[in-house]
């Protein structure tokens, strides 16, 4: 009698994806983040579903419905803060996952990589729309400022912004559609993740050496399931510590003030995970130029396969490229810090320098350093 795990049409797919999947024997903890992102997505969908049961997408009651969730619903405060901080964990893992891909040359799998870029854009859109839902000051003004950027598009811009708003300003119609999209997008993300995994399993995983590992594979279960559970426990420890001890650490105090179109907060800024892109946007004095730089700061990821000039896939044995990658990480941290600062000297010039170096490192320094390393190795 054949094993049901290997013969049942549905269970067979799960078996080939998570149990009998041949995996390289040397993949490190950096390969944990994919499964952690999956867990984060599931947590966000579950907590979000429970929040949606009590939330009302109306400008007059949205803020008070969030207050009601925190005060009157059983463990509502826990669900709300787990959802808000879960989003932060999601982005931390997302950035680690992308960093891993760049370091080990995983972008060579073109379909998987481009699917990942589509995923990050979708996740960013979802998080942005979720931020507008509590209808606090930063929700309202963040939504106003970011959607208003589309007015920089020549000819159709102003009409497009009014079409997105559903009126002449961010109002009830905007909040309702943001809620609708914020609810549906995680399910679309789940479908995109399935495609991302489908493409990955066509080629198999990369590994730290960057070499072909077909001659040395081990089953995913039990080796990597146990390894992933360790990562999962560490993630839950971090998330629960954040949620239970300092739930507002990563939030903005302005969002505890109900939205008021007549009172602008002194510093309008998005959530911390968008600050690097926000700093790039603000560093260019021209509106259209800023929007293009903002878009390109994310879409630049699609160029990585074309910019790879090294004869080696991974950065494991390329110390000069490693230095540049860590320089890029430091640069992104500086951009994140600048994005949260007011637009005044010296922050303006620091932001401009950090924005220029961000694009220079990726577009010029990394490819030329790779060529230099080829020369040093006489390749």
UniProtKB/Swiss-Prot annotation:
Give residues annotated as binding heme b b566.
97, 196
Quote the cofactor binding remark: Binds 2 heme b groups non-covalently.
Where in or outside the cell it occurs: the entry states: Mitochondrion inner membrane
Please give the Gene Ontology molecular function terms for this protein. metal ion binding; ubiquinol-cytochrome-c reductase activity
Pfam families reported for this sequence: Cytochrom_B_C, Cytochrome_B
List residues binding heme b b562. Answer: 83, 182
Kindly list the positions annotated as binding a ubiquinone: 201
Q: Name one GO cellular component term.
A: mitochondrial inner membrane
The entry's family comment says: Belongs to the cytochrome b family.
Leftover remarks: Heme 1 (or BL or b562) is low-potential and absorbs at about 562 nm, and heme 2 (or BH or b566) is high-potential and absorbs at about 566 nm.
Tell me the function of this protein.
Component of the ubiquinol-cytochrome c reductase complex (complex III or cytochrome b-c1 complex) that is part of the mitochondrial respiratory chain. The b-c1 complex mediates electron transfer from ubiquinol to cytochrome c. Contributes to the generation of a proton gradient across the mitochondrial membrane that is then used for ATP synthesis.
**Name of the featured protein:** Cytochrome b
